[in-house]
């Protein structure tokens, strides 16, 4: 990767961040969006003008357009830790125990936010809520930059330079790509996960495993990184040649490093944080590992709500969700022959998300599947597709970013 490539990507990324944040301010200043939102069955009661009353981490005016929904927990953990007395609590109906909702979220992102907030407070941003919110946006944006550089690098073996740039461009204009600059984990995650993929393809196993480990502690999907790392490890073997000389201690060490994301997940899962996460996922969020029956029922209910009850709000939301999943699924299958490791990582993201027991947030979850952008970049070789997709995607991106800025539900 040359200095020119880095310069071009950094410049485009910086312009994109400024445009996204400015656009949210412009739209919310110029327009008044009517509440509540009927996107899904539960949003009508959660998107009224008074719905955030008492949620102190969502009420700070500074950077408020970038803080909504799950941002509350990341800001709260960054300021007060997991046992923050201001955190929301729910009762487990099975045990009757009170559970702090902060435990639903992984630690690495909010802890990095805490680190970034320290110099901001020293520079005069003394309000801890404001400092944590700005830190969250900075961490997300920097993670996104790292992810874009890694995406460009991992596609170069089979793409022309123009195609790799196009993949980066499509990543930043995907309809839900604004999340990369919000107080959400997607930006940091693609920096770590895409970085791990790119480094492992280059043979930098130690750094790849470290990034993979940190990705695991950013969100649960990080555990899936063990799959592509193992594939890249096995691809080092020349199967038509004698195997014994190739199976050196270094080769076995690389295999062990490839398993680091899975080991990191299991370590975290058996900690107090992991136990709390699993408990909340089951009874509060209704999610689990490949919960196929409950997922089918959730998708059916979402379809019925969109068709019969929610009207245009729900139908558009549901169409974006389904469209994103189908596009990422097709992209993953298309990429298997060209780049099996990245393809299977993306496919695992799609399947684990779609069959998690819930039919929500799919368009956001698909953001972390690199095959999506690689497939679009291939299609974008056709100039008509490139122009058409660019217009369509940017218009949806603007709509989604605007809705998020006023606390409407977009995933």
Predicted regions and their residues:
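Transmembrane-helix motifs of polytopic, lipid-linked glycan transferases
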Residues: 113-117, 135-158, 327-331
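Membrane-interface transmembrane helices that cradle and orient dolichyl/undecaprenyl
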Residues: 159-162, 196-207, 237-239
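Membrane-interface alpha helices of multi-pass inner-membrane proteins
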Residues: 172, 176-179, 193-198, 206-233, ...
